[in-house]
């Protein structure tokens, strides 16, 4: 890929703007509307919060000055927020965001449900879970002690992530100085970036943005080593998706030197993949394959952010470029409207990051037409999951659908940033794209092809022995 600067214009972060005084609302008296069930993984996740901690979704909306999930969705979709959304200053923003995590990790009590003699206080070790009294904390300690250390990292990362949103944290970039085949995991990637990486991190640690970030939080700034580790984890979280796509290309030996460029589809894309996405976020994919003639990455899903919605071009790409675009639709509908009509080229690879079809009948129903389409058209497909348990469950679904599994296992480019299960804080944190599965076509069809290749041709001509 041709070298170019990563210092581009950054999109505005969510508003931190003056707003009218709004009196505190009793969340128990006014219950903001929750979304209707559907194929949106964002909506399903939001609904699930209420089953784990009754009243938590309403608490989140209330602290963000919102009346419904639709208003919340409008913000994470990149749309224009309602007038009531906003914060007087950065300090208030962090305070209100932290308020959305305030519930007793043991008895699940929310602030409005506490008696006057109780108050929620956080664990002093991790600063990430809350308890309404010492008895709940003691009762919860056997479970919490197993994850307290990791949750401390989560709490730091949650603050540091704001530097990505504001654009103050610019990831090191540029053509790889090492041979691509030498970069097999994060250790080799970090070694390759070497001095460039350390220079970037040290400059940010000493920056005014870092100072103001922790000053607005009103709590002590962690040691430099802690912040350094957090920045590296955040970096892997951003780069995990493009490098995991590269893993799929390597595994399937896809030709990236195809005239006109290669087409990659990210299906089931949500705000996780598309919110505040920037044009250079997938440049690392191009550097992974310096011989590429261009990558066209199209994100398809009902939760694709408005920032990414744009028409995808079928025109040939400039060699070494990565073009990002998005379509808000279910993939099988997108296929009928764009691929079958010839508007867009067939994909060289389809990827689904955490599709979750194993988790609920509703998601499986939404995913089934897409999975069958990918199988029947023999489209090279990569999916990722959070855990070994999800890997096994997803493999079982794919085996039941008679897909031909090519490879699966631990992802060498998994995110190193631990993710807290929002409404179950003592559940073991997970890591994005920790495991992967690659499949193509139908398993029984592959067996049939193999048998045909092994059987002798009944109509082959056998030459007579001249002797």
UniProtKB/Swiss-Prot annotation:
Residues 1-34 are annotated as: Disordered. A zinc finger (MYND-type) spans 104-148. Pfam families: MSS51_C, zf-MYND. It comes from the Eukaryota. Residues 14-23 have a biased composition (Pro residues). The keyword DNA repair does not apply. Zn(2+) 1 binds at residues 104, 107, 132, 136. Transmembrane segments: none annotated. Residues 1-13 have a biased composition (Basic residues). Keywords: Metal-binding, Zinc, Zinc-finger. Zn(2+) 2 binds at residues 123, 126, 144, 148. GO terms for molecular function: zinc ion binding. This is Putative protein MSS51 homolog, mitochondrial.
């Amino acid at each position: 890929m041709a070298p170019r600067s990563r210092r581009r214009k950054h999109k505005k972060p969510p508003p931190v703007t003056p707003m009218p005084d709004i009196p505190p609302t009793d969340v128990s008296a006014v219950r903001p509307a929750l979304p209707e069930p559907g194929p949106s993984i964002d909506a399903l996740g939001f609904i699930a919060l209420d089953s784990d901690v009754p009243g938590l979704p309403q608490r989140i909306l209330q602290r963000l000055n919102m009346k419904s999930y639709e208003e919340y969705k409008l913000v994470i979709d990149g749309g224009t927020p309602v007038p009531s959304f906003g914060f007087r200053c950065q300090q208030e923003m962090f305070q209100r965001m932290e308020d959305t995590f305030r519930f007793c990790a043991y008895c699940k009590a929310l602030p409005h449900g506490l008696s006057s003699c109780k108050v929620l206080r956080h664990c002093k070790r991790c600063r990430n879970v809350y308890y309404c009294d010492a008895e709940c904390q003691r009762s919860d300690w056997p479970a919490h002690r197993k994850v307290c250390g990791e949750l401390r990292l989560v709490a730091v990362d949650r603050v540091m992530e704001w530097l990505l949103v504001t654009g103050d944290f610019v990831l090191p970039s540029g053509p790889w100085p090492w041979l691509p085949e030498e970069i097999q995991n994060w250790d080799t990637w970090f070694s390759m970036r070497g001095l460039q990486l350390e220079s970037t991190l040290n400059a940010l640690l000493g920056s005014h943005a870092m100072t103001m970030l922790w000053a607005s939080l009103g709590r002590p700034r962690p040691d430099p080593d802690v912040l350094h580790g957090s920045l590296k984890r955040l970096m892997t979280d951003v780069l995990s998706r493009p490098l995991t796509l590269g893993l799929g290309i390597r595994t399937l030996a896809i030709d990236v030197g195809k005239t006109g460029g290669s087409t990659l589809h990210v299906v089931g894309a949500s705000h996780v993949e598309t919110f505040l996405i920037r044009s250079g976020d997938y440049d690392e994919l191009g550097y992974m394959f310096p011989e590429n003639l261009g990558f066209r990455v199209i994100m398809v899903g009902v939760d694709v952010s408005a920032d990414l919605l744009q028409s995808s071009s079928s025109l040939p790409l400039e060699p070494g470029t990565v073009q990002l675009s998005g379509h808000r639709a279910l993939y099988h509908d997108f296929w009928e409207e764009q691929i079958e009509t010839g508007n867009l080229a067939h994909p060289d690879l389809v990827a689904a990051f955490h599709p979750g079809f194993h988790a609920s009948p509703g998601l499986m129903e939404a995913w089934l037409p897409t999975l069958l389409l990918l199988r029947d058209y023999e489209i090279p497909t990569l999916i990722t999951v959070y855990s070994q348990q999800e890997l096994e469950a997803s493999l079982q679904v794919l085996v039941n659908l008679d897909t031909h599994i090519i490879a699966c296992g631990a992802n060498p480019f998994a995110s190193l940033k631990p993710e807290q299960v929002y409404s179950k804080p003592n559940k073991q944190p997970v890591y994005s794209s920790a495991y992967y599965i690659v499949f193509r076509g139908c398993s029984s069809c592959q067996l049939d092809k193999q048998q045909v290749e092994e059987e002798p041709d009944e109509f082959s001509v056998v030459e007579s022995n001249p002797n």
